[in-house]
Structure formats: C-alpha cells, structure tokens
C-alpha cells in the first residue's frame, strides 16, 4: 500500500498520484513552508501515543521476538520525542540555524544576508537492514522543511507505512510533505518518475543500490549517499580480558552483524599464527555463551543458505589459508590474509592478524568503506591507537560492546546528516 495526501491508497491510486507528482509538489513549494516546530510537535505526539497494548502486536506480527519488540518500541518513543529531536537539531545544525544572518563580507562594502532553506523535494530510497530507517530518514527531511518521497524497501513489514500514516493523521499539515510509494526496485520506469520529481535523492544501501541510483539520476540532481560501510574490532594483548571479549560477543549476537557498524572482522595485534588460532578457540566459546542469552531464530531458507556457506568455507579452507571453528549457533573463521571484508554474518566472525605497524596502510586500502572500530586495548595504548585509526579513515572508535550504540546528534559516516538536507541561500 501507499500513502498519498495522508491517505492509504492502492497501487492504481498511487500511479495516478505519481502522474501529478511534479505539479502537486510544486504547488506545495509555492504556497507553503514547513516550520520545524510543527514537525517537533507532531513527532512528540506520535511518541506519546505509541504503546505496547496497541503497537506491540504490529511488531510481533512481523516476526520480531517479544523482548526485541519491546526494546524497539521504547527506542522509537525516545527517538521521536521532541526533546531528542531538538537536541539532534542543535547538535547537527546549531541553535539558530533557521534564522537569517546578516554581515558585511571582508571584500565588500554592502551587507549580505544568508539563511538556510530546504533543498526542496527529497526522494528517500531506504534500505531494509535497520529497523525504522524509512521513518527516521523521512523525519530528518521534515525537520529541515523538505517534501519527502519515500520508496519503501522490499523487506518493509508495514510498520513504516503505519507510523507515517499516524504522523500525518496527528498533524494534517504534513500531508503535503510525506508521500510513501510501495514500488519494487525492478520497476525502473516508476522509480525514474520519482527521481524526476526530486531535487535530491537520499539513498541507503549496498554499492549496487547506490550505483543503480546514480544511473537513474541526471547530473543536476543532488545525490546524498549513505552507502555500504564496514566495521571491525581491533584487539591487542592488553585488551584481551573477559569483560572486553564478552562485550564484543554480545554486540555481535545483538546485531547479527547486519548493520554498517556491526563487527565483521576481528583484527589481532599480532604476527603469531598460533596466538591467533588460540584466540579463535577462546572467542568461539564466548560467542556461544553470549548467544544463549539472545537466541538466533532464522527462516529455514536463510538457515539453509548459511549452512551451505559454512560448508563451502570448510571445504575450501585449506587451499585459502583458513581454519573454520564451528560452534553451537556461531562460528569463527581464521583467515591468513588481512583484508577488510564482510563476514557471512549471523554470528559468523572473521579473525585476522594485523600488527599495529601495518594497521594504517592496510586500512587505507579500504578507504571510503571504513566506519566503526571497536577498540579493545590497554589504557596506555588507547590514545595512540585511536589516533592511528582516525588517520586511517575510521570515523568512530568505541568499545566492542558499544559499536552499534548511537547517541543523539552523532555524525553518520563522518557527516552531519541534517546539514546535507539544507542549502544556504544569500541575498545581497
């Protein structure tokens, strides 16, 4: 289903709306402007009405475990609250970002006035690997005053559509600023029409998804890419204590390595292969132990796929310089190479050797892909290694357990996302 003018409509009605989309959005841009206060009040009201009795069943019906569903509902209430969003805007845009600023440039005698304006119409092409992402990316567009066209991810479970419907129902003034289209990525002719109606495209997802959007967009349409990134842990001898390793394993089990800030590879600060193999055995038992607290439930098809992948890894291990350590609901794979590569996910972790002297040149070969590093080291090493990781291109360093824990107003992939959704205009 689709959301047009605040109403849930079928495919045919969405296609009719798509034909008029340029005209409709132009009318909104000409006749209206969207105050951040209206968006904040609406989001806060939505946060207040979300409750377990009404909305927990919606999450449970999509196959989410009950404890996970409760956690996600609690997180949604926080992220939608006015207090949270105000702080996010303050951190990312500054306290007076929407107020005009007048000044006389050093090279002119006449004053100039600058102010922030929305880009106009944003097309959000959301990925399905992060809960609530379609809703949150639209809200970022609303906070900056933009009209938002959302193409739902194929795997969306209906929660995004319902939350945005509720938001527009709470504040009807948003109806001209939120459109949701349930079109398949293969329907290129329809996606192209959405692109043609947009001033900028916000694309989340894989390299293939980003490349596909680049091919669709004309040169004058701004691309705001939140593409595929890789994250890893770096472990030194001084960081190999039970608390650190259990925290890292807990993170791996909680995220199933599905997010851009999930640990794919554990790098060890050593050249000693025997030490690395010993680490593999010890960490596997920790991973198994933490896995019992967060049971892994996968569809039969996905479980079969993982089984085949692990079987293939085992068969090819000796010829590729690998050792596969199989456990109950988890595995670790020792690799002789030191490349940063994605794991097969779902608690199947890669272990590689990377002495700190080789850390920067190795990571520089993956520049543009680096996101979070979980640093497990001694206190006396932390400053030096943190600086080295930042110089290599990593954008966030934290503990292993906190790799996927965000905070209000944090940069995304090293950038302030809200700043990318505005433009600065000047009058002289």
Residue ranges and their predicted role:
Residues 94, 99-170:
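Conserved small-residue-rich beta-alpha loop and adjacent elements
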Residues 134, 160, 211-215, 235, ...:
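Short glycine-/acidic-enriched loop or helix-start segments at secondary-structure transitions
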Residues 144-149, 173-174, 193-200, 365-370:
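Short, surface-exposed connector motifs at secondary-structure boundaries
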Residues 108-126, 183-195, 329-345:
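Donor nucleotide-activated moiety binding/catalytic core segment of transferases
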Residues 174-265, 270, 404, 410-428:
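Conserved NAD(P)+-binding/catalytic subdomain of aldehyde/semialdehyde dehydrogenases
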């Amino acid at each position: 289903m689709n959301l047009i003018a605040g109403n849930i409509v079928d495919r045919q009605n969405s296609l009719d709306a798509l034909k008029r989309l340029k005209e409709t959005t132009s009318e909104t841009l000409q006749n209206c402007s969207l105050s951040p206060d209206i968006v904040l009040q609406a989001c806060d009201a939505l946060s207040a009405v979300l409750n377990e009795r009404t909305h927990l069943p919606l999450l449970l019906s999509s196959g989410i475990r009950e404890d996970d569903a409760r956690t996600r509902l609690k997180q949604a209430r926080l992220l939608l609250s006015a207090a949270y969003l105000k702080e996010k805007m303050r951190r990312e845009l500054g306290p007076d970002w929407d107020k005009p600023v007048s000044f006389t440039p050093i090279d002119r005698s006449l004053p100039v006035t600058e102010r922030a304006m929305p880009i106009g119409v944003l097309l959000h092409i959301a990925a399905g690997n992060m809960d609530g992402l379609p809703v949150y990316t639209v809200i970022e567009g609303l906070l900056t005053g933009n009209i938002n066209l959302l193409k739902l991810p194929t795997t969306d479970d209906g929660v995004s559509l319902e939350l945005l419907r509720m938001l527009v129902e709470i504040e009807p003034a948003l109806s001209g600023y939120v459109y949701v289209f349930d079109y398949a990525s293969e329907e290129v002719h329809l996606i192209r029409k959405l692109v043609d109606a947009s001033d900028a495209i916000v694309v989340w997802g894989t390299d293939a998804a980003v490349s596909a959007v680049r091919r669709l967009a004309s040169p004058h349409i701004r691309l705001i890419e939140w593409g595929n990134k890789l994250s890893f842990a770096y472990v030194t001898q001084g960081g190999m204590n039970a608390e650190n390793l259990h925290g890292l394993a807990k993170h791996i089990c909680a995220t199933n390595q599905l997010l851009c800030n999930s640990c794919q590879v554990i790098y060890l600060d050593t050249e000693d292969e025997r030490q690395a193999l010993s680490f593999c055995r010890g960490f596997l038992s920790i991973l198994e132990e933490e896995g019992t607290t967060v049971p892994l439930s996968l569809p039969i098809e996905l479980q079969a796929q993982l089984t085949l992948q692990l079987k293939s890894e085992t068969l090819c291990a000796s010829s590729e310089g690998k050792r596969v350590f199989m456990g109950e609901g988890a595995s670790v794979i020792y690799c002789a190479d030191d490349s940063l590569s994605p794991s097969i996910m779902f608690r199947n972790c890669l272990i590689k050797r990377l002495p700190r002297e080789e850390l920067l040149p190795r990571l520089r070969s993956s520049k543009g892909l680096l996101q979070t590093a979980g640093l497990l080291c001694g206190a006396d090493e932390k400053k030096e290694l943190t600086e080295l990781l930042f110089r290599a291109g990593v954008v966030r360093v934290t503990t292993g357990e906190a790799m996927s824990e965000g905070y209000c107003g944090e940069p995304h992939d090293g950038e302030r996302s809200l700043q990318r959704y505005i433009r600065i205009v000047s009058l002289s």
